[in-house]
Amino acid sequence: MLGPYLKSDAAWICPSVNADWPGSHAGLPEPTYGLNFTLSGYLLHPAPTTAQVEASSETILAAESEQPNMNVGLFASPFIFPPSVHQPAVCGRHFGQANVLWLDGHINARRPATAFWSKGFMDVATQERLHLGDILKGPYTGNAQTDDYYYELVKPAGG
């Protein structure tokens, strides 16, 4: 979606990340922004168009990301996943907040909600320390239709 408009892959690396960050892998340049998996084309072929999105100002395009991994702690994640996948990947690198790019083009900082699960990849205390979680419209409910609101193309009635 954005590739043809970028001059280099450096646009996918947060300038604030350094070798001290747990997910930096000894300072190797890896993507630090993840694309909303729902928009990636892996689920829908071809990838959805912006015309298919009901509320572009309430749909995440990309956000700062890392993924938990039992062996290395964190690793670069090219995607952020809806909360119902139980794989929190939004990373609050900036005073606990993550930069979020919305489909309509606006950007803001959001504090990821710490997941109370992570498929066993990382305990909640470590997630909180690393500011790793999901972007939610409200508190976790356990209901995918509610929790996945910002990640979905079609919004539930009563949004």
Task: Give names to the regions the model predicted.
Residues 1-159:
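Short, well-structured segments within or immediately adjacent to enzyme catalytic domains
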